[in-house]
Amino acid sequence: MQTTIIYITGVYDTLDLFTQELKNAFETLGYASFTYDARLEEESKQALIECIEEGTKKGQRFFGVTFNNLGYNLALPEARTETGDACSKQNMGYSPKDINSSREPNLWETYEIPYINILMDHPFHYEKPLQNAPDTSVVLCTDRNHVHYIRRYFKNIRYTDFLPHAGVELGSRHKPLAERGIDVLYAGALPIYTVAKMIPDLSSIPEVDGEEMAQVVLSELVHHPDRTTEDVIEEYLKYKRNDISEQRIHEIIVQMRFIDSYATSFFREQAVRILVENGIRVTAYGTGWDQCEWSDNPYLVYGGKVLAPEILPLMNDSKIVLNTMTWFKAGAHDRIFNGMLAGAAVVTDDSTYLRREFTDGKELVMFSRNEIRTLPDRVFDLFGHMQSTQRMADCGYQSAKEHHTWKSRAAWIREAWM
């Protein structure tokens, strides 16, 4: 029986890169592909419906595999839901209540297609899509804490699980570290310069003083950086108001999620700044690095903003790839695995997941956010012992190649959810 996987592209270059890697991986496992291009919405939807209806007649199976809720609300055209249509909603398991509802018929629900939704960010960024997720959803989170968050606050989602980030390799022959031109590469924006649109009217939270809450929560995260943003917000709310409901806690967490980006930005900037101020040359790409008060430091090389695929060749020419988490405490980031697959020495802040998967100094270097002041010494040590650094990079490459590619993730999805 042929199985076709439906992908959605044409919205974000980073997600297109991940999607192409997953598509390649599933095709090597024997799955057929259909790619819905969001830039050609009507043509893509028509072609998708025809593909599903023709395939269903032949007994084929379909799955949607996508990122960050792309296509969650794909709806059928009205003409296809009228009585006598090949896809009668009553025949597809809809109740009279569903049929009389004003809600547009969801494509995934109508055709009973599992919608496998991989979240690359914290679920609190996706309140509306997750509350309105198709009934056929399987939500895969890249941090174990996010799985708990989904189970607690999104009771409508029946299936959720943990799927770590994965890496992409460009080419198969990688230069030795000694021959590479970039000393330390940081590829990622400073969120503090792009987060303004997320900040709510802090006076609109009647239960507490919003400005005070923002300051207290951010301070707690900075001083105790192993805590999650949602836990600290909840702790503050319950300290101030012991009668606050579960639903209201969730609503305020969503409103105050910008604090997560502030904390991420604080440590990201701190990691790069402490290196350049200690005479280590860092090449940084992404929004915001040219707006810091210390941006004129001669050891900071700012490369501007580039698309996701353009980062991979830069990693291939980097001795060290530096990563800081997007406040993930029980997950990873694709920068880590991309850097390993580029044959670079990866230096990253730790997480419970990374500590289980790797050994500090064997496949990569891990540092605690509480000990960020030791970071320059760790990096100087790598440059001072290039033979052992090369061995670590080689070990990291082998580990990522065997366990942390999108091919590995596709194999897991197949076993667990297909």
Predicted region positions:
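Nucleotide-sugar donor-binding catalytic core of glycosyltransferases
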Residues: 9-12, 18, 153-329, 351-354
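Catalytic binding pocket for nucleotide-activated donors in carbohydrate/polymer assembly enzymes
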Residues: 9-10, 17-24, 29, 34-41, ...
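Short, hydrophobic beta-strand segments that form beta-sheet elements in well-ordered domains
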Residues: 35-36, 116-119, 138-142, 162-163, ...
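Short, surface-exposed amphipathic charged segments that create phosphate/polyanion-binding patches used
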Residues: 130-134, 174-184, 380-383
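Conserved beta-strand elements of the Class I
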Residues: 4-7, 185, 345
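Extended catalytic core of nucleotide-activated donor transferases of GT-like folds
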Residues: 5-9, 16-153, 168-173, 303-310, ...
